[in-house]
Amino acid sequence: MANHLQFNFQDATSPLMQELVKFHDHSLTILFFISALILYVLMMTSLSKLTNKNILDSQEIEMVWTVIPAFILIMLALPSIQILYLMDEIASPDITIKTVGHQWYWTYEFSDLSKESEIESYMLPTADLQNGDFRLLEVDNRISVPMDSKIRMLITSEDVLHAWTLPSMGIKVDAVPGRLNQVTFSSSLPGLFFGQCSEICGANHSFMPIAMEVIPLKTFESWIIKLSL
């Protein structure tokens, strides 16, 4: 989860987020070299006393400043397109969960199980927090998903626009009334991950957290059995 004075991403817990972090580093590396080159040229130009006012055009220079930017754009576009296709890929899921946004809480429906189950997830008030709980992030009912499994999340809203977001997994999906948006993800690491509604949805928008536990498959099966009782 996020820390105080943090300027970087949260630790990546899904293949998608790992690719996004790699692309971020790749882009910043290119931008660093471009900025360094421009700064060097500006300094050399401002400090140099050599000038030539007779040069009106140069085919060689025009070719260079056309080819090099095109090459840089290709270096940025190829990994970006790969990630876009990865985000839209819908593989055969192991489990499907329907997420519905409300003002101002979430509901999760497990409809493809032998017995349909549903949980409501509200933020815990500050007065109900225990030692070690996180203010404005803890909920009364956490959603659990199995580790190393393909999860398909169907996301919609009952009232206004919301956005279901888990930064550590690189997920941000709009919850739109009357429409189902979907996303697939998986996590290779167990743990507790937090997110929040990322679309302004009213007075209590800031009090609409998301808490997801990634647990081993056997533990998830036990959790589902208890949920169905």
From Swiss-Prot:
Residues 46-59 are mitochondrial matrix. Residues 1-14, 88-229 are mitochondrial intermembrane. Mg(2+) binds at residue 199. One of its GO terms (biological process) is ATP synthesis coupled electron transport. Keywords: Copper, Electron transport, Magnesium, Membrane, Metal-binding, Mitochondrion, Mitochondrion inner membrane, Respiratory chain, Translocase, Transmembrane, Transmembrane helix, Transport. Its cofactor is Cu cation. It is found in: Mitochondrion inner membrane. It is an enzyme of class 7 (translocase). Cu cation A1 binds at residues 162, 197, 201, 208. Its EC number is 7.1.1.9. It catalyses: 4 Fe(II)-[cytochrome c] + O2 + 8 H(+)(in) = 4 Fe(III)-[cytochrome c] + 2 H2O + 4 H(+)(out). The chain crosses the membrane at residues 15-45, 60-87. One of its GO terms (cellular component) is mitochondrial inner membrane. It is a multi-pass membrane protein. Binds a dinuclear copper A center per subunit. CDD domains: CcO_II_C. SUPFAM superfamilies: Cupredoxins, Cytochrome c oxidase subunit II-like, transmembrane region. Cu cation A2 binds at residues 197, 199, 201, 205. Pfam families: COX2, COX2_TM. GO terms for molecular function: copper ion binding; cytochrome-c oxidase activity. Component of the cytochrome c oxidase (complex IV, CIV), a multisubunit enzyme composed of 14 subunits. The complex is composed of a catalytic core of 3 subunits MT-CO1, MT-CO2 and MT-CO3, encoded in the mitochondrial DNA, and 11 supernumerary subunits COX4I, COX5A, COX5B, COX6A, COX6B, COX6C, COX7A, COX7B, COX7C, COX8 and NDUFA4, which are encoded in the nuclear genome. Component of the cytochrome c oxidase, the last enzyme in the mitochondrial electron transport chain which drives oxidative phosphorylation. The respiratory chain contains 3 multisubunit complexes succinate dehydrogenase (complex II, CII), ubiquinol-cytochrome c oxidoreductase (cytochrome b-c1 complex, complex III, CIII) and cytochrome c oxidase (complex IV, CIV), that cooperate to transfer electrons derived from NADH and succinate to molecular oxygen, creating an electrochemical gradient over the inner membrane that drives transmembrane transport and the ATP synthase. Belongs to the cytochrome c oxidase subunit 2 family. PANTHER family: CYTOCHROME C OXIDASE SUBUNIT 2, CYTOCHROME C OXIDASE, SUBUNIT II. This is Cytochrome c oxidase subunit 2. It comes from Myxine glutinosa. The lineage of its organism: Eukaryota, Metazoa, Chordata, Craniata, Vertebrata.
